Amino acid sequence: QRQMCIRDSALAARRGQRRGLSWGVTKEEKEQYRELLGGLGLGLESRLTTKVSTLSGGQRQALTLLMATLKRPKLLLLDEHTAALDPKTAAKVMELTDRIVREGQLTTLMITHNMRDAIQYGNRLIMLHDGHVILDIAGEEKKKLTVPDLLEQFTKASGDEFANDRAILS
């Protein structure tokens, strides 16, 4: 089975198809994809025909984010989109995410267990426990929040200790 390259992925995101995509690519579209990929800062702009399967995890996540935002969605859903990445790559993908969301003025729902990311990014933090909203923090209160503060508020609101060491240590 034919593996998709970066160009095919970008076209599939735009056209909603998988096969026979590259024949309809104009020079202007190729240049647009190069510019968009160049904005990621990952050296992908010169690799339009590179198979996606050969990219690093961070490159794939950044490409996926770019594809998801090509058509300016009404709502961008990000579900643990940095969870499988090493800390340095995760930080780079989060910076890219923040830039793309801000520049595109995209309404975004990001699900994460990373407390620092939950505090640092976005304008509202909602914490769930056992399927219920136990914290909803925004504005100045969120800006002043620290991980220890968040853990303390979680304990008070839920009556439980936070049990996910990975999230605490993130």
Which residues make up each language-model segment?
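Short, small-residue-biased leader/transition segments that mark boundaries at the very start
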Residues: 2-6
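Conserved ABC nucleotide-binding domain
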Residues: 36-53
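ABC ATPase C-loop
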Residues: 68-69
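Catalytic Walker B motif of ABC-type/P-loop ATPase nucleotide-binding domains
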Residues: 76-79
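Helix N-cap at the start of a conserved alpha-helix in ABC-type nucleotide-binding domains
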Residues: 87-89
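Helical segment within the ABC ATPase nucleotide-binding domain
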Residues: 91-103
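H-loop/switch region of ABC-family ATPase nucleotide-binding domains
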Residues: 112-113
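Conserved beta-strand-loop-alpha-helix hinge in the C-terminal portion
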Residues: 132-158
